[in-house]
């Protein structure tokens, strides 16, 4: 089953869709994989963790699919902690070295999505070692926001958090959100 996720993500769709806001794509994910997201969110895909590929697929479902399925709602971030733990375990095991650079970039995304400065220091090391300029650049941009605010201000409204005046000013700047 996890092969379906990886085939879809890395073979079937174009990379431009990975981070694009597209309602049709979000609906497609919901139709094809909504039930898998539900199982992953409930912790029911533990069997996938027997291989690094299965773990990567579960991370993609929890981290990336959540953002598409529940765009603009608190649920879009609801599985970030679980995805981060799975990614940390895969890295600790050393098995992630078997993945392609592109796949490892997605395994590392829960680090980039974290609002922890400590986790971002680890993310910076991971993306530096990965040696993919675009992904490293994105991590540097994410880390700068966490270093400055301790959180992602663009999530404040979604999560019901009050923005500080400095965050409000930042949010008015072009490119302040992801």
Give the residues covered by each predicted segment.
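Intrinsically disordered, low-complexity activation-like regions
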Residues: 1-57, 61-72, 77-178
